[in-house]
Amino acid sequence: MSDNSHNLLYNKFELPESVKMSPVEGAAGGIDKVARFVADPLEKGMGHTLGSALRRALLIGLEAPAIVSFSMTGVLHEYMAVEGIIEDVTNIVLNLKGSLLKKYPLQDCEGGRASQKLRATISIDASDLAAAGGQKAITLGDLLQEGTFEAVNPEHVIFTVTRPMQLDVMLRVAFGRGYTPSERIVLEEREMNEIVLDAAFSPVVLVNYFVEDTRVGQDTDFDRLILQVETDGRVAPKEAVAFATQILSKHFSVFEKMDEKRIVFEEAISVEKENKDDILHKLVLGINEIELSVRSTNCLSNANIETIGELVIMPEPRLLQFRNFGKKSLCEIKNKLKEMKLELGMDLSQFGVGLDNVKEKMKWYAEKIRSSKNTKG
């Protein structure tokens, strides 16, 4: 347990209150397969930092189930044909690779992370063939007769039967990440004539991110991160982003343990959470009405900053541009504002105040407050 005396005070970081998710117009599959996520405001540079990290984690880190092997009555190896089935085994293998299954390996879920064998018996008689016009398509949904997996594309055709027959089919399903070629897949208790498949485990099809400029109050030097995620349906985009975030947090925690010193961040002050009248009474105060050193007061006076409102709307970097305004004066002013539950770079737009009109607005509000006091008196 670290001592609080080792904590380091850091200036606040602008963070989004939430991440906004929206559908992508014209995208097939709707929001369950394609979604756009917008996070703003972020500190300059954080848009690319987070976007790149999330993109890599989404593409390489997420797990999903996939069919890794199968066996079927009459099938001895991959390079053969089966009498009464249109597709040869090579094409059946390709169709199985296009099968999409979903199920999460929760700790309390039957089977957990171990591979599972799903067995099905397909019985096709003459009446089935007649009803299907002589060719009966066997779909992924037909093969999922047991187990706890759900087909994302149940109508996906695996093979087509042209004569009455009965087939026993076994599908082995496992969990993994990324893409694993068949020669790297290890099967426990492999059955005779069980054919191993290449497995595409990753449920994420495409990830793009963009970074735009955005503003906080009058300061435009912030990032907006736009992340667009497309999945194959085994995992929804919203889940994918949440899982990728947890994966990154897990890895970053290893580096966090290197030092016991903890960072304590100053919190951003939300005008919405404060009483507006109280805020206004503070904003109209003159700089000479608060206890600042002569040096800091003179620096503000030389910059033509006369009221607290004119001060707090000013971004920190802009203050440092004023002549003779140094880090010592900045630190003193920030501490004084913190005592007043104010800060630099505040958004005063709800009061109709911006950098271009702050001086006039402060005079107007000061007069309004004086008139209100006189009326009450």
Curated annotation (Swiss-Prot):
Entry-linked InterPro entries: DNA-dir_RNA_pol_insert, DNA-dir_RNA_pol_RpoA/D/Rpb3, DNA-dir_RpoA, RBP11-like, RNAP_asu_C, RNApol_insert_sf
Chain residue ranges for the region called Alpha N-terminal domain (alpha-NTD): 1-259
Keyword annotations of the record: DNA-directed RNA polymerase, Nucleotidyltransferase, Transcription, Transferase
One CC-aspect GO term: DNA-directed RNA polymerase complex
Alpha C-terminal domain (alpha-CTD): annotated segments: 276-377
Enzyme class: transferase
Catalytic activity, reaction form: RNA(n) + a ribonucleoside 5'-triphosphate = RNA(n+1) + diphosphate
Domain of life per record: Bacteria
EC number: 2.7.7.6
Alphabetical list of Gene3D superfamilies matching this protein: 5' to 3' exonuclease, C-terminal subdomain, DNA-directed RNA polymerase, insert domain, RNA polymerase, RBP11-like subunit
Entry's transmembrane regions: none
GO biological process: DNA-templated transcription
GO molecular function: DNA binding; DNA-directed RNA polymerase activity; protein dimerization activity
NCBIfam families: PRK05182.1-2, PRK05182.2-3, PRK05182.2-5, rpoA
Role this protein plays: DNA-dependent RNA polymerase catalyzes the transcription of DNA into RNA using the four ribonucleoside triphosphates as substrates.
Family that this chain belongs to: Belongs to the RNA polymerase alpha chain family.
Domain remarks in the Swiss-Prot or TrEMBL record: The N-terminal domain is essential for RNAP assembly and basal transcription, whereas the C-terminal domain is involved in interaction with transcriptional regulators and with upstream promoter elements.
Subunit structure: Homodimer. The RNAP catalytic core consists of 2 alpha, 1 beta, 1 beta' and 1 omega subunit. When a sigma factor is associated with the core the holoenzyme is formed, which can initiate transcription.
HAMAP family reported for this sequence: RNApol_bact_RpoA (MF_00059)
Protein name as annotated: DNA-directed RNA polymerase subunit alpha
Species of provenance: Chlamydia muridarum (strain MoPn / Nigg)
